[in-house]
Amino acid sequence: MASDFLPVRRALLSVSDKTGLIDLARALVARNVELLSTGGTAKAIREAGLPVKDVAELTGFPEMMDGRVKTLHPLVHGGLLGRAGVDEAVMAEHGIVPIDLLVLNLYPFESVTVKADCTLADAVENIDIGGPAMLRSAAKNFARVAVAADPAQYADLLVELEANDGQLSAAKRFALSVAAFNRVAQYDAAISNYLSAVADSAEAVPTRSPFPAQINSNFVKVMDLRYGENPHQSGAFYRDLYPVPGTLATFQQLQGKELSYNNLADADAAWECVRQFDAPACVIVKHANPCGVAVGAGCGDAYELAYATDPTSAFGGILAFNKTLDAATAKAILDRQFVEVLIAPDYEAGALEYATKKANVRVLKIPHGNGLNNYDTKRIGSGLLMQSADNRGMSQGELSVVTQRAPNEAELGDLLFAWRVAKYVKSNAIVYAKDNRTIGVGAGQMSRVVSAKIAALKAEEAKLTVAGSVMASDAFFPFRDGIDAAAAAGIKAVIQPGGSMRDGEVIAAADEHGIAMVFTGVRHFRH
């Protein structure tokens, strides 16, 4: 059993990132801690006017092989691994002095290899060998030794030393040990991922496979959740170690109840949909499907139009905006309906003040960022499906008009709007839209024609006029029945991928009804 508090009398410092190094070293020296160090770290400490002993002086071995061998020595690892009450005799026999604190961060492999022009030689030279070995030695012996693997840990470390007369508690040593082992695991995973991706490349700047022979993922827990998708399931939320700027995982919760599994899944769908629009937009999501989407002159206008698509489904929904949410819109929302989550890149002070009247509403702030997710993954039984993320946009110039009548400018704008929305609706997906707002959404049906009929039914329930609207379909129409259903509802233009064996039949149906139709050549299945 580890002693609760143990003094720090000797520390070994060896860091690539020298953030906070001198302040830490100065504080340790002030407590009469003997400093051992290597290479550039020792040089920096010495230049700050602080006493430090080179590890080479301790071991009697110089640094060699351009610094590849510095600390791989029994006098170093024995000093870290020696057990109190067990190994004192053998340590004394071999002249091994105990090291109580290791401060070490690793060669910057991740930041070097993220550069597009990184050569294989550059990558290999930034694979740390002695560093992970020392981290593991110190972390294994947390019963006696403390280890700091990140400059962010220095402040808390010094606070505990100050509060306990130069001693560290067993709880602190254990927590630091876990963090060190996690850091080594992350580091080794980064090396494995990189080398697995370039395994067969002989180029100086190797080509990297998007799907390497082995993948190692690192996620850190953000929070426990009340439960999973259902109350009998447990759940937690983990964030990617390096989250993409602007994605959901970068959120800050400003108020409200704890988030649920379903809250986060729906919030991701809403946020990814709304952030693709440049003009002020609102997306309302229920069960991971947009039930109302609109672009307007401002947030308030966009919300009113999105809400009108399906007021019933909007109850208890997730609302996302791509612009700063103003106080008037926040009041209009919260006075009208029950909301699970509000999402925006920022909020006016008045909006946040009014939101406090509904203390249970979860208010999330997600800073703007242009980053896109690179991959989508899905767990299956004992396996993982991995694909490049569906980041494919669509411009007017990419559309192919396939009918006798071409869409007019207003219809083209609505077609592209509906296409953006359809990308985030579960397949089979049909979206009716007009004037940059959804009129009806048909989602998740096994038959495409049924989705088309549901979209018309939802519009009718909301007392919205389908006549003159456009229709987007996430995949091709296998038969003409979907076009016939759209015509019966009053649809005037259609956007779809094309590619069916019966495209000719579908195009003929559109011509019969005087419908303009464009092909994108891109499918947006979503399961």
Curated annotation (Swiss-Prot):
One Gene Ontology term of the molecular function aspect: phosphoribosylaminoimidazolecarboxamide formyltransferase activity
Residue intervals of the MGS-like domain: 1-149
One Gene Ontology biological process: 'de novo' IMP biosynthetic process
Pathway: Purine metabolism; IMP biosynthesis via de novo pathway; 5-formamido-1-(5-phospho-D-ribosyl)imidazole-4-carboxamide from 5-amino-1-(5-phospho-D-ribosyl)imidazole-4-carboxamide (10-formyl THF route): step 1/1; Purine metabolism; IMP biosynthesis via de novo pathway; IMP from 5-formamido-1-(5-phospho-D-ribosyl)imidazole-4-carboxamide: step 1/1
Pfam families (alphabetical): AICARFT_IMPCHas, MGS
GO cellular component: cytosol
SUPFAM superfamilies, sorted: Cytidine deaminase-like, Methylglyoxal synthase-like
UniProt keyword terms in alphabetical order: Hydrolase, Multifunctional enzyme, Purine biosynthesis, Transferase
Enzyme Commission code(s) on record: 2.1.2.3, 3.5.4.10
Superkingdom, natural source: Bacteria
UniProt entry tagged with the keyword Transferase: yes
Catalytic activity: (6R)-10-formyltetrahydrofolate + 5-amino-1-(5-phospho-beta-D-ribosyl)imidazole-4-carboxamide = 5-formamido-1-(5-phospho-D-ribosyl)imidazole-4-carboxamide + (6S)-5,6,7,8-tetrahydrofolate; IMP + H2O = 5-formamido-1-(5-phospho-D-ribosyl)imidazole-4-carboxamide
Notes concerning its domains: The IMP cyclohydrolase activity resides in the N-terminal region.
Family, per entry: Belongs to the PurH family.
Name of the protein this chain belongs to: Bifunctional purine biosynthesis protein PurH
Species for this entry: Xanthomonas axonopodis pv. citri (strain 306)
Gene: purH
